[in-house]
Amino acid sequence: QIVDVQGRECSDFQAFSMCALDKGVEREIDPTTTRSLMGSIYPSPGIFSKYWTLDQEALVQIVQDTCGRHDTFGLACTARYYDDLGYPGHINCSDNMNKDLARFNIKPRGGWPAINFFFNTMLDDTNALGMDDPWSRPGDYVMLKALTDLICISTACPCDIDPANGWNPTDIQVRTYNTTENFKKSIGWRKTAEAEMEETKETGFHKSFARYTRNFIEYNGFWLANDMTNIGVVNEYWACREDAAIMDLSPLRKYEVTGPDAKRLMQKCITRDVEKFPIDRNVTTIAIIIPAIPK
């Protein structure tokens, strides 16, 4: 678990396969392979959650992410970067990584490819790669699961000359947990910029769907089944046409209105004539709720 203690601090992460190192071969996370296999600019909790080596071996899997904004394009910051900007001799992540990895006989590099957690980069209309202050807030974290024996390294980026760390480098905390611990996959999200962070939830039907699939995707704060194992899209199509299909609509936030005054309450909330609603069928309508203003 890589924790941004005070918020807006980048951490350049890399992991090496110990099995490969024992054979004298360096095989670490390769960002390009990862993007190609996952089909996204960086993995996230769910079905497309793994980081891969150049040999297409999965090393780690992201289980939880409360920030949701990272980078896989840039190197860990280098001496050359600071030299070019007029800060020769500035401490940098690549040199720090070289020093710590030397004891494992890992060869030094002028710039390390890395997973730059909490690094806020974007592509503009001219295809230029830019950066801005990180989105991470105090206590935000990513949780990773090792898929094999690894040597891992994670930095607290010392950059203080651009927005990478909000112009103020702070601490990164790394926690490790026993293999007996079990963490549910989740993505942190906020309804508004000022709202408290909420984690992705399982619906009341999750266990029933989990008997038939492991492919769950995040939607509107919930994990929903994306497909059923060994069924396929063609069979799903014909099931919708000729047989039956089941969907979990929990994220739509539907409610049941019951009781002797249910009809009167509904008539106050909507413009449709409730008396014309069929008793034994579902009805879709929209209610606009306006909060009362205290006098």
Pin down the residues of each PLM region:
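Glycine/proline-enriched, intrinsically flexible loops and inter-domain linkers
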Residues: 180-295
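Acidic, Ser/Thr/Pro
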Residues: 1-189
